[in-house]
Regions:
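Glycine-biased, small-residue-rich flexible motifs in mid-sequence functional cores and linkers
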Residues: 1-187
Length: 187
């Protein structure tokens, strides 16, 4: 189910995920990376969740870019409710809300990990911006690896206090980047 316009760009998108409780540095980096994606005409795919997801999507659409919000509920039930305005901006900026569930389906806990496979599957690459040891972002990274996607972490905040999960991904082979352009240089 889609609300809005699904971008016609194949897999040429970047999925960005992270903690719902980011540090100040994580917020700045999410806004920066989202804006960089907009400047490069690279749609941002994320879960419209509190924290890194919504900051990266906000950075993208505020810079004139396109974003896809993959929901763990129906497209007529934006969750969290605090992101209703962001969801409207995503739709009005030629992006969309996407869900595998009927339009008015409620958000239930078990649906969040399930939708992560869609977040990673829509893009060529996944950026785990900031993630603690136990994070849904790490579930998304596992899906990305299973799907043959490249996984990146953010070099600038790699050693931040809330980033043990991303640091673990880096130690397991994820590439650390400082900008979106670094992703293309690693291809």
């Amino acid at each position: 189910f889609v609300r809005g316009a699904l971008p016609d760009c194949g897999f040429n998108m970047l999925s960005i995920v992270g903690t719902r409780c980011p540090t100040g540095e994580g917020i700045k980096m999410a806004l920066k990376i989202g804006a960089e994606c907009a400047y490069l005409s690279l749609p941002v795919v994320s879960g419209l969740a509190r924290g890194i997801d919504s900051f990266s999507q906000r950075g993208c659409v505020e810079a004139g870019g396109v974003s896809i919000g993959v929901l763990a509920c129906g497209v007529e039930r934006v969750y969290p409710r605090t992101n209703i305005r962001l969801a409207s901006k995503i739709i009005s900026s030629c992006g969309c809300l996407l869900s595998e569930y009927p339009p008015f389906t409620e958000p239930l806990k078990f649906r969040f990990p399930q939708r992560n496979r869609i977040i990673s599957g829509l893009s060529k690459a996944l950026l785990v911006l900031e993630a603690p040891k136990k994070s849904g972002a790490l579930i998304t990274a596992d899906f990305a690896l299973e799907q043959g996607r490249d996984v990146f972490v953010c070099k600038d905040i790699l050693y931040s206090r809330k980033n043990e999960g991303a640091l673990s991904l880096y130690e397991d082979g994820a590439v650390a980047i400082s900008s979106v352009k670094d992703i293309f240089e690693n291809k």
